[in-house]
Amino acid sequence: MPVSKREQSKDTGDPCALPKLPIPPLKQTLDMYLTCMGHLVPEDQFRKTKAVVEKFGAPGGVGETLQKKLLERSEQKANWVYDYWLEDMYLNNRLALPVNSSPVMVFHKQNFKGQSDVLRFAANLISGVLEYKALIDGRALPVEHARGQLAGTPLCMDQYNKVFTSYRLPGTKTDTLVAQKSTVMPEPEHIIVACKNQFFVLDVMVNFRRLNEKDLYTQLERIRKMADIEEERQPPIGLLTSDGRTQWAEARNILIKDSTNRDSLDMIERCLCLVCLDEETATELNDSNRALLMLHGGGTDKNGGNRWYDKPMQFVIGADGCCGVVCEHSPFEGIVLVQCSEYLLRYMRGSPSKLVRAASMSELPAPRRLRWKCSPDIQTFLSASADRLQKLVKNLDMNVHKFTGYGKEFIKRQKMSPDAYVQVALQFTFYRCHGRLVPTYESASIRRFQEGRVDNIRSSTPEALAFVKAMASGSKITDAEKMELLWTAIKAQTNYTILAITGMAIDNHLLGLREIAKELKLEKPELFSDTTYATSIHFTLSTSQVPTTEEMFCCYGPVVPNGYGACYNPQTDHILFCVSSFRECAETSSDLFVKTLEGCLKEMQDLCRKCNTEVKPADSTQRMEGNPKVMKNGSKS
């Protein structure tokens, strides 16, 4: 969903100047949980769930005890859910980062005519990265303000501080998000360049002076030549970072027994970012294939080993013009990736000739190749990591589709929220493909609050179900009635969005109640061992709106084996959809979903045209505004 517009502001961006994330009333969350799940599970199961929820929320019950403890936690913490959420969403997850966790930004295809063009692009990009880091360090980034629903509120800028200073350290049971800020160690002043599965240290500060683009180009040229020296070739250790987190942690524990490996790991873990110079792939570089290459590198026979997935920002520059960014998601949200990427593309467009004008340093120290000592155990881990990456590559099914029937301008003319409209369209599509609705995740920014990240907008509402059923073929419902149901579904979606962005949704609250019960070493409350709760957090449809102003798009993989990832980028006259699924699942098909989505969007447009030819602004505004903070169950935010 759209969360930010950038404005010059007197605000400092200091998280402490923002309000704390509120804790919703217990009864409100429990009522809303039942409303969200009643139509998604069998009746018998729901009856049992209702009894479990009533017991949990009863006066003097366990729910009240946990709520009281959460309120106490809120007094002591800047953000009561942040640690719980970070561990649950990312650090405890044992799946491999590529496809399963790390989103990517795919740039417009570049037309490089040779290696010098590639290195010039890379030098220009690195120069932009250093400019952007200087803005972050100098607290000179304009404070962002919310747009869309409840526009104008200043947003927490804390996530930007983690872009170049954090690292996701693998652990056998849980990972650690490491902040590099240290009073003892000097600030990192190097970038790691990956080339032909080798890793090189590129110092960006020499003799207290930042390298200009000519210097960077010279160093990148040296790195390219060093990577070609066969007898110096090191094993593709980057493959280990593409594996499951426990496997990578076990391999790393073996690696660090050797001092050479420790030094190499230290240089990577403390770098600003990675720049991955990829080889040509001999692949047709349409949008879908570029998305796949960005998500997993194409596997071991392409550029799958030319990565280090633990680092938040990896800038990929392919010799064939396939370029973009791979993002380790735990330190920050997609909007930060968008803003950084858009800054870099604007910077590069505005400074194409610096390389020619700049004078180079006469004496530049040679870039350093990172070396590895590989025991037989590490060779075994490498082989297993390569096999698992290949399996992931073969399994991922991606369809990037530009829907050109209309864009957000048409939707706005109907006096509807484009995001709510697209969410209802995705529900319509899933229902038409699978004959049911499922728990759906749409990320909602809670950056209005100190250290705010996201909560979940549950888009599979009862109102959406009523609409999609009415649109089923053979329905005797009139167009006017269908239109009324569409309005109701969009209003319900809009209302839930407002609840989520104001800290009143249910997912973070339920997570907090669950985790504080663990901390208190209480027996797991029945609410969280109930089948309906397991269903509620199995997000078969994982969605996110990631709008861009530059020519690029974001995509990611499904979050469950039988699910879809659906990222969308609404523009004035078209909407770009990136739909992913797994080939191993017989139920899902990205191509079928996209084809069905196209039809559903056209049907919704036809319905709007039939019924909204004379949209009365006053009527439609009243319809959308109504009481936007009141849910169907009467709970208020």
Swiss-Prot record:
<dbReference type="GO" id="GO:0007626">
    <property type="term" value="P:locomotory behavior"/>
</dbReference>
<keyword id="KW-0012">Acyltransferase</keyword>
<feature type="region of interest" description="Disordered">
    <location>
        <begin position="1"/>
        <end position="20"/>
    </location>
</feature>
<dbReference type="GO" id="GO:0008292">
    <property type="term" value="P:acetylcholine biosynthetic process"/>
</dbReference>
<dbReference type="GO" id="GO:0045202">
    <property type="term" value="C:synapse"/>
</dbReference>
<comment type="function">
    <text>Catalyzes the reversible synthesis of acetylcholine (ACh) from acetyl CoA and choline at cholinergic synapses.</text>
</comment>
<feature type="compositionally biased region" description="Basic and acidic residues">
    <location>
        <begin position="1"/>
        <end position="13"/>
    </location>
</feature>
<feature type="binding site">
    <location>
        <position position="445"/>
    </location>
    <ligand>
        <name>CoA</name>
    </ligand>
</feature>
<dbReference type="GO" id="GO:0004102">
    <property type="term" value="F:choline O-acetyltransferase activity"/>
</dbReference>
<dbReference type="InterPro" id="IPR023213">
    <property type="entry name" value="CAT-like_dom_sf"/>
</dbReference>
<dbReference type="Pfam" id="PF00755">
    <property type="entry name" value="Carn_acyltransf"/>
</dbReference>
<dbReference type="InterPro" id="IPR042231">
    <property type="entry name" value="Cho/carn_acyl_trans_2"/>
</dbReference>
<comment type="similarity">
    <text>Belongs to the carnitine/choline acetyltransferase family.</text>
</comment>
<feature type="binding site">
    <location>
        <position position="545"/>
    </location>
    <ligand>
        <name>CoA</name>
    </ligand>
</feature>
<feature type="active site" description="Proton acceptor">
    <location>
        <position position="329"/>
    </location>
</feature>
<dbReference type="InterPro" id="IPR000542">
    <property type="entry name" value="Carn_acyl_trans"/>
</dbReference>
<keyword id="KW-0530">Neurotransmitter biosynthesis</keyword>
<dbReference type="GO" id="GO:0007274">
    <property type="term" value="P:neuromuscular synaptic transmission"/>
</dbReference>
<dbReference type="InterPro" id="IPR039551">
    <property type="entry name" value="Cho/carn_acyl_trans"/>
</dbReference>
<feature type="binding site">
    <location>
        <begin position="407"/>
        <end position="419"/>
    </location>
    <ligand>
        <name>CoA</name>
    </ligand>
</feature>
<dbReference type="GO" id="GO:0005737">
    <property type="term" value="C:cytoplasm"/>
</dbReference>
<keyword id="KW-0808">Transferase</keyword>
<protein>
    <recommendedName>
        <fullName>Choline O-acetyltransferase</fullName>
        <ecNumber>2.3.1.6</ecNumber>
    </recommendedName>
</protein>
<dbReference type="GO" id="GO:0043005">
    <property type="term" value="C:neuron projection"/>
</dbReference>
